[in-house]
């Protein structure tokens, strides 16, 4: 089976596991989530309660299997029901409002951190023992800082003490209106600087360390020595011979780390009150808004799986061995 | 020199691992004796109005919270709870990882495929949203459910690494010899395979502890824990919830965050040390050597002394190594006819 198809099958299995876990978790946990929701939000209509029972279990909704099939149908049509805290807003419209913020912020800053960290890792590995390499323990400290804590400090110093950059919310709601207009985009960019900086600073050291380690191992390979012996310029040996090969494990690591970065970014959004999916998740947790929590979990999982698929395609592009295997079979 | 002293000098190989071990040891010490030496009851709200959100002073070394609670006492108890949880999760999840990894590699065939698939699926599904979902449904949130949930989601990475290593060891001669001599499967696993994976398992344990600290602090910060207990995460939760940030009470939210970061750094340093112990190439070399006035890096070709006449400074030499000129330096015979 070609590489990409094999990976597609794997992601299909992973998505199915996530969807199924989402179905069984509320049913397996002690207590009845629907009853606690009804007790908390007495204004829900009987229709809405019925929909909740279908989603979370409890009540008389036919066999478990038929509930499961109906639930699968809803997931595939992105029908996540109505929200209970902001009744009767559909959950999908709440997601639609928040996903773009998180996607742009976390996506762009993760790619920046990856490129920057990989580049620095190449240099640190090449000049093994040089000043960049020796600065790594310091960078590890930044890596160990929880995202949200660095966010707290930045909000305090840059936002509150120095007033350099705005903190809280994704744009200035008093002077701009969302849409494709220049003041709004400018304001949104200004509000994104600090959150993006937080992600880049805390995740860069991880990329750098990994790239440096692979780079050091790669430099010891015979073909790199051969390239040097041929008298190729240092730049060519570094980037075309060593770094290109060292990049492959790095890319695989990137796929696995996306989930981690997204998790950190979710909590970070809470500190900045950034109008993304992380803040929505916090509100859902604090108000026992189970349908919203479930939908957010699924959406984040699907996004991470999609990102992994994209990384796999990049790997196919960079690694001729993967392509060659496809031709031979 | 005494034997333990020599081991101490040789074992961590690098200063990095030593610093990591000492730092983590300090936090471990704080966790053990913290509750005995803390100056106040961490939950006691001092009604004295001058002690509401007071700056650090001789009585309260790290100041007080908005309700007059002593931050230092909270920190000492919090370090204990956080480290306790992380170590427990580390032990449980690493044990599960070793069990799954070794079984999967040792059995092979269907079970290997199946267990690998399960661990890869768990790896690719983002952990924190799943943790939040699991804990969100629990009517009672406390230390024990958090430990269980974190352990359940914490084993796949270790299992993957252990499996890869076991696959390598499984085909070695000494395993074949043990099989031929009629050793049972579990005996081979326990006495021949696992002892050869100790450094890997140690690294996996350190990583799991790191993950448990990060995840438990994040979960507490979101509010998904027993908010009446004091852990590093709940201190941050209350600091954030009671506007410590907006009121400029840095002594309230900086110490717990720095504590988390320092524990994390010590574990990363320890892990790097373990890594470098297993793979000497990764150890820091001495960097560039100075030969005939020019800096020569270990990755540079062996220099021909006759060409090293032009001496360059640090930055100049570094920049020059990227330029076209360096190509000519390295390829042209001494006479330079090719120019």
Language model features with spans:
Chain B
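Transmembrane alpha-helices
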Residues: 80-96, 186-218
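Glycine-rich helix-loop "coupling/hinge" segments at transmembrane-helix boundaries
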Residues: 123, 136-138, 166, 207-208, ...
